A protein has these predicted regions:
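Terminal-tail/helix-coil boundary detector
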Residues: 202-217
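Conserved beta-strand edge residues that scaffold enzyme active sites
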Residues: 35-36, 165, 210-211
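GST-like fold's C-terminal all-alpha helical module
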Residues: 98-198, 217
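Active-site-flanking alpha-helical
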Residues: 20, 75, 172-173, 206
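GST-like domain detector, emphasizing the conserved glutathione-binding G-site
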Residues: 1-131
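Phosphate-coordinating loops and pocket residues in cytosolic domains that bind phosphorylated ligands
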Residues: 47, 85, 169, 198, ...
Length: 217
């Protein structure tokens, strides 16, 4: 049965589920939703996700939203991949870092994404707000220190094996340069992201995200 992914490819939340599918070799059909045109705010899309957010997975009659849940569902199709961990403690550690991303890392990165990318390019609503940037910078450094420390002595977030935690947290780093993340002091984060970016699945997903919508669909 075909796995359909409703995504807006520039979003890190879309990227992470697309990258997991690519890494696992799961064939998917991408359904591109244009956020600036309001395509998530239609009755048809609300029937898929009442929150009117992407990404959404649809497989037959089964519909799942929230990127973390989608990633776990995809990884569950290929448990031998190790993306979910091999033991209960490993799975809990991976889940902990996925939740850390939702609670801390993603909101910190989102400040920069909104101020430097969404406002000027999508909303066309003016210059970045210095107060918002100052608050975002404080948040970013608080949590970048945590992540940098966690990566010290580890190839990936939870150890020597690639897991869903890496896809969850690493996706935002794709926009670090245009969104001006203050990541320069964090050598472990930069080293780790370089490892992720070199993955074939990561490269394939970056290429998909660069496609025109019609071609990607």
């Amino acid at each position: 049965m075909t796995v359909e992914l409703y995504v807006f490819p520039p979003s890190p939340r879309a990227f992470r589920v697309m990258a997991v599918a690519n890494h696992l070799g799961i064939d998917t059909t991408l359904r591109i939703v244009d956020l600036p045109k309001g395509e998530t705010r239609t009755p048809e899309f609300a029937a898929l996700n009442p929150n009117m957010r992407m990404p959404v997975l649809k497989e037959g009659d089964y519909v799942l939203w929230e990127s973390g849940a989608i990633m776990q569902y995809l990884a569950g199709k290929k448990p031998e991949s190790g993306l979910l961990g091999a033991s209960e403690r490993e799975r809990l550690d991976i889940t902990r870092w996925q939740l850390w991303d939702v609670a801390h890392w993603d909101p910190a990165c989102a400040v920069f994404a909104f101020e430097y990318l969404v406002k000027p390019i999508i909303l066309k609503s003016g210059e970045p707000d210095p107060a918002a940037i100052a608050k975002g910078t404080e948040l970013f450094h608080n949590f970048a220190k945590v992540l940098d420390g966690q990566l010290r002595g580890r190839k990936f977030v939870t150890g020597e094996r690639l897991t869903l935690a890496d896809f969850s947290i690493g996706a935002a780093m794709n926009i670090a340069e245009p969104a001006r993340f203050p990541v320069e002091p964090y050598g472990e984060i930069r080293r780790w992201y370089g490892t992720l970016r070199a993955l074939p699945a990561w490269q394939r997903t970056l290429a998909q995200c660069a496609m025109p919508a019609a071609a990607a669909a």
